[in-house]
Amino acid sequence: MESPVRLSLLYVVLASLLLPGRSVFINRERANNVLQRIRRANSFFEEIKKGNLERECVEEICSFEEAREVFEDNEKTTEFWNKYEDGDQCESSPCQNQGECRDGLGSYTCTCTEGFEGKNCELFVRKLCSLDNGDCDQFCREEQNSVVCSCAKGYFLGNDGKSCLSTAPFPCGKTNKGRAKRSVALNTSNSEPDPEDLMPDADILYPTESPSELLNLNKTEPEANSDDVIRIVGGQECKRGECPWQALLFSDEETDGFCGGTILNEFYILTAAHCLHQAKRFKVRVGDLNTEQEDGGEMVHEVDMIIKHNKFQRDTYDFDIAMLRLKTPITFRENVAPACLPQKDWAEATLMTQKTGIVSGFGRTHEKGRQSKVLKMMEVPYVDRNTCRLSTSFSITQNMFCAGYDAKQEDACQGDSGGPHVTRFKDTYFVTGIVSWGEGCARKGKYGIYTKVTAFLKWIDRSMKARVGPTSETPRLTHPPY
């Protein structure tokens, strides 16, 4: 009896739905009362199935935990959830200047490219010296949150306030290989001077050995074998114009030269103080590429004045620096030009944080070998100060730095002492060191030790200003105070 009644009621409902003007659709609540279904997420079988994004979060509204079951990764889940919960905040591409947008809940984050900052990377970052050297060609310093560029002596600042230009035919710090003309500048930096006694004793010292070896203390002769290491020997030949600042100190007895030097301007040569103990009288040759051949580019200059640092220590090689004033000025040309002197702060922050510097000279090709007849150059990496200190039992003072290879058989050797260590920055070479000493030549685990030029820039400058007036007949040894 009950069944026919239910059927009758169903017919009435259906008939009423089909009457004209009545909708064939009913709302969700009424429909659920008519056709009920079990939601899959609540069933036992659904819970044990692996998460499915479409089933969990598209067909149904899901929770963060359900989305996490699908991605099984917090970062990916968060990235999806931020968009799922309130839409993609990055859809409008709010980040400017190629910034990368990351969506968040009700917000977004921009990761800006170098040189931009701000919420939307809309702000241009001021380029200070730590970023691309402030776009300066040479020296850079910061002043009132802005960059001030300047140039080495012999250059002037361009109209852009960044570039360094020169009208000199051979400016300092420029290699002249393949160039018809280049220029030089009387390069100076910050430095100081003073005088001292006549040249001390004329003991013959052996450059680039350790201080104690020079004094015959704990002297050990290296074993001669076929594996003798090669240093600037292991380097490459300097072609014409590649090492124009190289000078060679030689005596009548040592025509091949006993030490090197760096041309700073037409009158001054930078060298090592310990070189002054190897000959009572010597001359300076510039423009030489091969000591056995003359090509017309060599020039010999007599020394008018010798300026040695009065704190030079012969037992430790601390303050190993000296200046030579020439009687006649150097004529600069393709193969003869000075290296630039840097500014102290800029050099220590920028130059000496470069990966490598360059040394050159006529030094021995092996630890116990002969002097090289040709001028050689070699790129040597700067060595961390702590690493260098741990490599030797000798003192590495604040006036020294280390460069070279731990195992590679290349180094500076005897005869290279006093020679240039220069560092390149934007095609300009600046003096950064003086070849001073080392334990043997290119021994494994040992590095070359160099006088740190930035520690003496004021001394150098004042030394070059110390002597005014006509030259004297005999060389004089003066001594600027530090």
From Swiss-Prot:
It is an enzyme of class 3 (hydrolase). It is found in: Secreted. It holds the Pfam family FXa_inhibition. SUPFAM superfamilies: GLA-domain, Trypsin-like serine proteases. Inhibited by SERPINA5. Residues 232-465 form the Peptidase S1 domain. Its main location: secreted. One of its GO terms (cellular component) is extracellular space. GO terms for biological process: blood coagulation; positive regulation of TOR signaling; proteolysis. Plasma; synthesized in the liver. Residues 86-122, 125-165 form the EGF-like domain. Keywords: Blood coagulation, Calcium, Cleavage on pair of basic residues, Disulfide bond, EGF-like domain, Gamma-carboxyglutamic acid, Glycoprotein, Hemostasis, Hydrolase, Hydroxylation, Protease, Repeat, Secreted, Serine protease, Signal, Zymogen. The modification 4-carboxyglutamate is found at E46, E47, E54, E56, E59, E60, E65, E66, E69, E72, E75, E79. GO terms for molecular function: calcium ion binding; phospholipid binding; serine-type endopeptidase activity. Disulfide bonds join C57-C62, C90-C101, C95-C110, C112-C121, C129-C140, C136-C149, C151-C164, C172-C340, C238-C243, C259-C275, C388-C402, C413-C441. The keyword Electron transport does not apply. The modification (3R)-3-hydroxyaspartate is found at D103. Glycans are attached at N187, N218. The two chains are formed from a single-chain precursor by the excision of two Arg residues and are held together by 1 or more disulfide bonds. Forms a heterodimer with SERPINA5. Interacts with ixolaris, an anticoagulant protein from Ixodes scapularis saliva. PANTHER family: COAGULATION FACTOR, COAGULATION FACTOR X. This is Coagulation factor X.
